[in-house]
């Protein structure tokens, strides 16, 4: 039985993690975010009502679940307050269900200013960040000058630390990027206005999770972004600023690494990517347009159109390695309905003519990589909302089986629509 289950993306994010976390939390006592910030965008559809969460874990809609933001998450007080208000206006008692680690680094206005100034300065070489201050906040953490939730317990000391770090960053903003300084008093006042709310939710997350483990409670760890955006293992420098792989669970929450029981990789039936960076199977033709339109491929956080392409099993195999995946949840299979043929990338042809079945690491090494495809018959029947495997067309079943063969990982869950009821659970991770 798997008490500690990790749910993470196996591609470049936007795989459909939020819905699956929400579905599986029916049995969980805790849902934990362990990396990223409000650059994530998790969309849940329950009884036709749509909820988009950026920072708060997807378990917040369940009254039986306690949601936890772990130390690996960079926390924007402004974003958290906005999200809390939206949920509380709908009658969801967020403060009764949400806990925070005091070690969460804070994202403040100067981080956002730095993020946007840098992207503008990069010009054509812009990474395509969400402009939310995520990267600069992680930089401050590593440089040991970052302010954390725990600093808010001593308001006087917080004000002194804030002044010091803002002098440092404002010097850079004004003298290097030639933009306006961020106002110290405003940042201080805004943060102090919500300090008591934040500190009232603080808990020792590592201790809580260890006690939960000893009791045998079910815990779900919710990843944000995707494996191929990992700061260490992704398409660097076109990556996010945190560890999106399963290793981030231990460092970003305080759970001992030996206690992860099952890692569920969310796998979209085709590939998408937001922002710049390598994408060997990207389609620029009418099929790419079809996938974008049918899949409604626009970012939940930025509204940007996602780049679309065929499923890349070479890249997915890298995700299998990095995360020691136990099983897949295949999402958005219905988007492929109506295509005469579907393709799977099974290898890459390198610029020197070699065929390889593993991904390069640095983004520069992906230049000139061509996908080698395996073509399979498509299906005309609708798979949307199908709740039983026997209701799927044979061609769709063949596609599923081939993915399992190419990756060596079973598909344990199949999602056929945005609602939590439109799902086939072939093997429940908590029972695995």
Curated annotation (Swiss-Prot):
Keyword Disulfide bond: no
Assigned EC number: 6.3.4.4
This protein's name: Adenylosuccinate synthetase
Similarity field: Belongs to the adenylosuccinate synthetase family.
Cited HAMAP family: Adenylosucc_synth (MF_00011)
Reaction(s) the record says it catalyses: IMP + L-aspartate + GTP = N(6)-(1,2-dicarboxyethyl)-AMP + GDP + phosphate + 2 H(+)
Domain of life: Bacteria
Binding site for GTP: 13-19, 41-43, 306, 332-334, 415-417
Cofactor(s) needed: Mg(2+)
Cofactor note (record): Binds 1 Mg(2+) ion per subunit.
GO molecular function annotation: adenylosuccinate synthase activity; GTP binding; magnesium ion binding
Active site, per annotation: 14, 42
GTP-binding is among the record's keywords: yes
């Amino acid at each position: 039985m798997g008490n500690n289950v990790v749910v993470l993306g196996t591609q470049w994010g936007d795989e459909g993690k939020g819905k699956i976390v929400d579905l599986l939390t029916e049995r969980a006592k805790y849902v934990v975010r362990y990396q990223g910030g409000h650059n994530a965008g998790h969309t849940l559809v329950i009884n036709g009502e749509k909820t988009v969460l950026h920072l708060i874990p997807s378990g917040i809609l369940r009254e039986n679940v306690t949601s936890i933001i772990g130390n690996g998450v960079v926390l924007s007080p402004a974003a958290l307050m906005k999200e809390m208000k939206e949920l509380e206006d709908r009658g969801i008692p967020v403060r009764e269900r949400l806990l925070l680690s005091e070690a969460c680094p804070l994202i403040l206005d100067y981080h956002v200013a730095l993020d946007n100034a840098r992207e503008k300065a990069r010009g054509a070489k812009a990474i395509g960040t969400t402009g939310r201050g995520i990267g600069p906040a992680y930089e401050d953490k590593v440089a040991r000058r970052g302010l954390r939730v725990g600093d808010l317990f001593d308001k006087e000391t917080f004000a002194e630390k804030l002044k010091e770090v803002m002098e440092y960053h404002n010097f850079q903003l004004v003298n290097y990027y030639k933009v306006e300084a961020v106002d110290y008093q405003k940042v201080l006042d805004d943060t102090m206005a919500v300090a008591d709310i934040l500190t009232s939710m603080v808990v020792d997350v590592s201790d809580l999770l260890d006690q939960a483990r000893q009791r045998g409670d079910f815990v779900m760890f919710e990843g944000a972004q995707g494996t191929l955006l990992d700061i260490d293992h992704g398409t660097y420098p076109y990556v996010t600023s945190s560890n999106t792989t399963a290793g981030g669970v231990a460092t970003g929450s305080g759970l001992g690494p030996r206690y992860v029981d099952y890692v569920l990789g969310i796998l979209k039936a085709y590939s998408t990517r937001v922002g710049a960076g390598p994408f060997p199977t990207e389609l620029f033709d009418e099929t790419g347009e079809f996938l974008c339109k049918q899949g409604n491929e626009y970012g939940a956080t930025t509204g940007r159109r996602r780049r679309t392409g065929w499923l890349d099993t070479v890249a997915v195999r890298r995700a299998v390695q990095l995360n020691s995946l136990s099983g897949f949840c295949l999402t958005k299979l219905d988007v492929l309905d109506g295509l005469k043929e579907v393709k799977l990338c099974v290898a890459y042809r390198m610029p020197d003519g070699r065929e390889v079945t593993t991904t390069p690491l640095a983004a520069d090494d992906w230049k000139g990589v061509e996908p080698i495809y395996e073509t399979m018959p498509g299906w005309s029947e609708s798979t949307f909302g199908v709740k039983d495997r026997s209701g799927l067309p044979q061609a769709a079943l063949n596609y599923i089986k081939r993915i399992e063969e190419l990756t060596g990982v079973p598909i344990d869950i199949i999602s056929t629509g945005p609602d939590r009821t439109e799902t086939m659970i072939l093997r429940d991770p908590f029972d695995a």
